Each structure stands twice: as structure tokens, then as C-alpha cells.
Amino acid sequence: MAAAASSSSAASLPQTGAEIRSAFLRFYEERGHKVMASASLIPEDPTVLLTIAGMLPFKPVFLGQQERPAPRATSSQKCIRTNDIENVGRTARHHTFFEMLGNFSFGDYFKQQAIEWAWQLSTEVYGIDPKHLVVSVFREDDEAEQIWRDVVGVNPKRIIRMDEADNFWASGPTGPCGPCSEIYYDFKPELGDEGIDLEDDDRFIEFYNLVFMQYNRDAEGSLTPLANRNIDTGLGLERMAQILQKVPNNYETDLIFPLIQAAADCAGVDYHQLDDAGKTSLKVIGDHSRAVTQLICDGVTASNLGRGYILRRLLRRVVRHGRLLGINKPFLVMMGEASIALLKDAHPSVLERQEVILAELQREESRFLETLERGEKLLSEVLDSKPKQISGAQAFELYDTYGFPLELTQEIAEEQGLEVDLAGFEEAMEQQRQRAKAAAVSIDLTLQDAIDQVVATQKATAFQGYQRLEQPSCVQALVANGEPATSASAGDHVQIVLESTPFYGEGGGQVGDRGVLSGADVIVAIESVSRSRDVFVHAGRIERGQLTVGDAITAQVDRACRRRAQANHTATHLLQAALKQVVDPGIGQAGSLVDFDRLRFDFHAPQAVTTEQLGQIETLINGWIAEAHGLLVEEMAIDQAKAAGAVAMFGEKYADVVRVVDVPGVSMELCGGTHVANTAEIGLFKIVGESGVAAGIRRIEAVAGASVLGYLNERELVVKQLGDRFKAQPGEIVERVVALQDELKSTGKALIAAQAELAVAKSAALATKAVAIGSFQLLVERLDGVDGTGLQGAAQSLAAQLGDGAAVVLGGLPDPSDQGKVILVAAFGKDVIAAKQQAGKFIGTIAKLCGGGGGGRPNLAQAGGRDGAALAGALETARMELTAALQQQG
């Protein structure tokens, strides 16, 4: 393969983030890869809080725990990482939310093909000149170096060997592993090939990582070749956008900068005129706004635990940085709206979940503003004690507990003639970092390996949770901070196997229980429970004392959480029964989620459930709840259960003896989950959404019990806000909105007509500027403040005035204050067309000079661009090229 860039014209290369994404997926789809939709940010893997890498959804396939979806796959995966959150906005490349483009081979092609395709994509599809590329290989991977050098043709001086820490991937101390090779972009190739240091972040950026899983590492550390070798790659969308859009950092790409601009507009500042601190705050707001929008969209709600804590922390950082910019009013909803507008084309679910997203943003911002007020009150109390300085511990308490920015504490202290103990604050911050590092969200295959080791030695856990929520038990095995252990202490994150347990382990769509393990001198907060080969693994954190294998403890399930989960689970059964009754008796379940605060049910259906049908389903379910049906739960032979009419999930494997949950006269299903004793315990049921999640699969989301009240309160708040905004009573809002839409439509039509009239009026004066070239009349002029329709009308009018030899090119900015939108129009008479000049082809070429494109008919065409600064030069080029072409014909 030649190491040369494609000869494709620059204008045909991907530029926008959307174009880069689609070009990647199309490239690999054309090469036999199955395009996989992005998985949720909430992974199925219970050991990981969030999806933090493109390969995470395929982790069970790589570990041999799941069948491969296809021999080859490709995806654009949503990811969240928060381990370096302090660097967001301070460096050019750190983000919380990002997209990882990836191509994967599950025992199909391997190293040479992966390398060749990666190079072809980079140089031919993305058009990167090879002189800007450097590759790294593992120090012992002679094969990869040989492929890069001899097959691809990379200059040997630009192939850098790296150590194991940088270029060798492993799933854990044992298991699948292999070398990797990375492609870097060189911003300064003129510095030459000698002494290349890939750690130089100002010169190099790694954008494509190729992992070659080719070995199995045993307990002794020996490597043996795998029978089925795999490929796992990742290309950072934001990084590629920075490279192709030629901007100084990821934040100034079209993937993020519109959000930075929205925040800047809200603050009344100019991003490009700010100092580094101000720019950092805008970058944090832009980055975090994408992240929180996607997290809420995928079902995360703010809390003080797990994913909820990550969401809350990100939201509060947005508010804090807004205050640093002088934004003292609520603005999260505005940023949410801007994020949805930016993300909706690539991620339609954010638009479908817009109401939920904005409600969560509004609610959490209101809470935090109250928290800030309490922090200000505490700071006032500290100042009232007349201290010589504000201690580091006090400043950190304000920061950590109340979300009070250090900068704000310093500012207030300075007004009082005081200083803040920054060294003490940093010491407290470092201690917090170490605690966070121990609990960092990572793609912890090592943790799963440790859990698997422990589970393999254990017998099945005796589950007692159907009968009781509290019971004595004994610690059988323990994993502490990712390693098998015999004991663990306060602050440690642990996975615990008990002899018997009342905790329900995640399964059948229902989340695992929460609760507490307590002993003579220990308390463990249990945050989730999973199952592996009938062994229940309790994950949590030791709050106090020490826990040792063999300890006697009391296991206590959080009763409130269990009640909510079992109400939602029974409601899910009622939902399936109602769907069969209202929509189609043949409806089959495709998946479900039973959480503490919500439920969702996926089912096979060719089309959406209508609004009328959803209303009938709600009425039916609430009727069954009001009828107070007592549930019957019993175990029976699988054949007996099916003969009785029990519903089973298609494709699910069942034992010979199954558990049947029966709501007499309503529903009978095979189910191992927990349920209410009587439907009346559910209280109330409300559908909150219906959507499509895949071809032929629909999803209904709902709330039940106390969650219904919360949902209705949110809706009531939205209605009140709309009423206040439109100065209308609730019953008048729809009428008021329709009237405003009609008014806006009418005004828009009037504006278009006025612009067209203005353009035609201006064109009369322009006609006198036409230049005669033989029998042709050439007119190239700039006309700002006119939209595309008006500019076309003007061009047509001018061409008609100038006759069959007219060659008219007009360009302008529809909004002179917006340099990011350019419109170009060409109108050619029939003599010009006969002279082999076509308006469509010509204007498309000129538009590329403004960073755009377009085309149309031979006699009339329109194009657009994104670079207003280039418009004058583009029009001059049009004038010169047409002059030369027409002179040849004249």
C-alpha cells in the first residue's frame, strides 16, 4: 500500500463531526462490518458505573462470555470519563463526554488488515497528509513495525517503539492480552523526524488506537497465542474533528463550540477576548452540558451515590463556573436546550427525552442554588468568629460539602482582609483525590477477574429474600479494592459473598437490592447486588470498622427500595397484560428494566402505540390496581406452567422447575423477581413515554407509586412555567402557542417577501455594473442581508435583464453579524451554458472556498459556506475564472 494521501479534493473530505462519524461507519460497513448502535451510558456490566470506552459493550464477547454479534462490527459509542475531571477545560483534549469510533474483529481479520484499513481511513477518507502522521508500536512487536514499514510504507523514523505501559493491553493479571499500535497526528512536521517524543502534547495528539488481542497470559505470566485473535480499536471523534477542522483544541470544534458560545452569550462575554480562566470556565460548561444531557437521557438522576453522584457533580460544576463568569441566574435549562439542539441529529433520544432532561436540570439547579445559599451562610458564620485566616479544612468543607467554589471563598475573604490557607486546602483536596482514585470508575476487567476467581470457589448462595428482608449470615469471600482479600477496612470498596442472603441479585430486568451489612464493629453500605453462577455478589463500601472472611453479620435490605422495586415489577407484568389486551395478543417481551424509581418495557411491535391506546392501557392498569388483586406465587414444572398459560420470554432458558407469578384473571408469567402481595400496594401507574429503540421494537417507560407524584409535580411545574411565560391559564396554553406559531409563520412569510422585494430592488442598481466580455455580460457582486430565496430572485432578475449571455454570480451573508453562514447563487443565460459553463458545477466549486458546497441546475444554482471571511476572495476567484472562460469563447 502506498503511503500517500488520496487525490480527492479537500472539499470532498469530511469536515463536520457528523461527516467524520458517518465516514468512519460507512468505511467499515463497506468492508463487511455490522454497524452497531451506541450502547447506553449505563452499562450492563455491574462492575462498571458508566460506559467509558467503545469496547465496553463488547467486553463479554472478548472474554468469551457471550456470542459475537457478527464476525466484524463497528460503532460510534457514547462514553463518559470523570477520572481527570480537574483537567477538563485546562488541556486541549480532556473531556467527560466523548464519542469513540471503533472497528472490531471477533476472531476474523487481524493485525495487517487492521493496520492497512486504519491508514487508508486516515489518509484517503480523512485526507491527512502522511507527513503529519507518526505511529507507535509495542517494543517487542516486530510484526506490527514490519507491516507499517514494508506494507504501508511509513518512514521507519516515524515508527516509534514504546514500553508495555504505553503499548500493551491486558484484561487483567491473567487472560486475553496483546500489543497495541497508535496513530498520532504531528502538528509540527517541519521539526523533522529526529528525536521524536510522543509525550510532547503541543506537537502530537494520539487519535487512533489499535489493540491486537493475540495472547493469553497465565498465572505465571507466560504468554501463549490465542486460538481466536481479536481486534479492538478506538478513534476519538472530538480529536479527529480538531485535526480536520484545524482548530487549536477539541473545544473549538463544531461538536462543542456551539455550547461554549451559548454560555458566552448568557454571560455576555466574548470567548476569544477572555483570559485563560474565563475560557476554561466556558469550556467546562460546554463539555459538562453535553455530558449531563446524555446521562439524564440514559436514565441517570442526580443523587449522592454512584452514577447519580457523578451527574450531580457535573451539574454543580456547570453552575459554579457559570457564577465565575457572572451568571447568577438559573441557566442549566438553557444549556440543556442548546445541548439537545446540538446532539439531536446524531442522538435522537435526547429530543425524545427532552422533557425529562430539562426537568432534571431545573430541579437539580434549584437544589444547588439553595445549597450555595447555605454555604454562604456558613462562610458568614466563619467570618463572624474573626479568624486570622480561613483554614484549609474550612475552605474544603465549603467546597466539598456545599459546592462552594474556592475562588468565591477567596474573593469574600479578601473583601474582609483575610487569606485562605491554600496549602491546607490542597492537602484536603489531595486526600479527596486519593479516595476518589480508589473508587475511580474504570473499565475494571481486573475487578471482574478477581470476582470471577472468588465466585469460582464458592457454592450457590442461599437466597431468602422472598421470605424475609433481614437475617443473620456469614461472610464467605471478599474482594477489596479490586483484589481477592481476607479482610477490608473502612473506606474500602468491596464485593462480598455471603452464605445466605435476603438481598435480591440483579436479574430478570430487576435491579439488585440496596441495604446494609452490620456486625459487632462494622457497617457496610450495599449499593448493588449481582449474580454469577447462582453466587450473589454484594457490592458496596465499608463505612465503619473492619470486615473479615468468616465474620458473622446481619444482612438488612433497604425496605423502602425493595417496596418500590417490587411495585414496579408487578406493574411491569400488568403493563404486558394490558398491551396484549389493547394492542395485540401476540406481543412479545424484548427486554425490561425494573428500577426503584421507574420501569421500562421493550416489546416487539411493527408500529408505535397510539396516544388513544396508551390512555386505554393506563386506565386498564389503574383499574386492576384499584381492584386489589391478590398475587399467587408458586413453583411448578415448566410444562405445567406453560399448560396453565404462563407467559415466558422468548429465547430465555428456564429450569425444569419454574416460579410462576399469577395475578388471577389478569396476568400469569414465569418470573424470579420480587412482587407486591396485592396490586393495591402499587398505588398508581403513569406512562411517561413511548418510543422506538430498534427496528420492530418499541419501548414504554412508566412510573408507579410515589414516583407518580414526583412526575406529576414536574409536569405541573412545566405547565406553570409555560403559563407564566405566555401569560395564560393552563387551559389556554395550547391555544396561545398555536396562535404564536401562526403569527410567527405569517411574520416569516412577510419577511421572506420583503427580503425578496429588497433583493430585486437592489438588483436593478447592480445591473449597471455588468462587464461586457465579447457577447457575454459578466456580473459578480456581493449582496449582504438577503436570504437564499431573495438572492436567487435577484440573480434571476439580473440574468433576465442582461439577456442570454448573462453570467451572474451573487454572494452574501444573510446576517452580516454572523460570519458563519454564506450564501452563493449563480444564474447563467443559455449562451453561457452553450459555452460549457454550468451554474450548478461552477457555484459548487466556488462554495468550497468558503468551507461549504452546493449545486443545482445549469441555469440556476445555490450553494452555502461557513467562512464569511473567505467570501470576498471566493467572489474574486469567480470573477477571474468566468472572465478567463468567457474570453476564450468570445
Curated annotation (Swiss-Prot):
The enzyme class is ligase
List, alphabetically, the InterPro entries matched: aa-tRNA-synth_II/BPL/LPL, Ala-tRNA-lgiase_IIc, Ala-tRNA-ligase_IIc_anticod-bd, Ala-tRNA-synth_IIc_core, Ala-tRNA-synth_IIc_N, Ala-tRNA_ligase, Ala_tRNA_ligase_euk/bac, DHHA1_dom
Q: Name one GO biological process term.
A: alanyl-tRNA aminoacylation
Name its cellular compartments: Cytoplasm
Would I find Transcription regulation among this entry's keywords? no
Cofactor note as given: Binds 1 zinc ion per subunit.
Q: Which domain of life is it from?
A: Bacteria
Cofactor(s), names only, from the UniProt record: Zn(2+)
Q: What reaction gets catalysed by this protein?
A: tRNA(Ala) + L-alanine + ATP = L-alanyl-tRNA(Ala) + AMP + diphosphate
- The Enzyme Commission number assigned here is 6.1.1.7
- Quick one: where is this thing mainly located? cytoplasm
Q: Does the keyword Acyltransferase apply?
A: no
Query: What keywords are assigned to this protein?
Result: Aminoacyl-tRNA synthetase, ATP-binding, Cytoplasm, Ligase, Metal-binding, Nucleotide-binding, Protein biosynthesis, RNA-binding, tRNA-binding, Zinc
Please give the Gene Ontology molecular function terms for this protein.
alanine-tRNA ligase activity; aminoacyl-tRNA deacylase activity; ATP binding; tRNA binding; zinc ion binding
Q: Which residues bind Zn(2+)?
A: H569, H573, C671, H675
GO cellular component terms attached to this protein's record: cytosol
Similarity comment text for this entry: Belongs to the class-II aminoacyl-tRNA synthetase family.
PANTHER family associated with the record: ALANINE--TRNA LIGASE, CYTOPLASMIC (PTHR11777:SF9), ALANYL-TRNA SYNTHETASE (PTHR11777)
Function according to Swiss-Prot or TrEMBL: Catalyzes the attachment of alanine to tRNA(Ala) in a two-step reaction: alanine is first activated by ATP to form Ala-AMP and then transferred to the acceptor end of tRNA(Ala). Also edits incorrectly charged Ser-tRNA(Ala) and Gly-tRNA(Ala) via its editing domain.
Comment, domains? Consists of three domains; the N-terminal catalytic domain, the editing domain and the C-terminal C-Ala domain. The editing domain removes incorrectly charged amino acids, while the C-Ala domain, along with tRNA(Ala), serves as a bridge to cooperatively bring together the editing and aminoacylation centers thus stimulating deacylation of misacylated tRNAs.
Instruction: Name the chain's protein.
Output: Alanine--tRNA ligase
Gene from which the chain derives: alaS
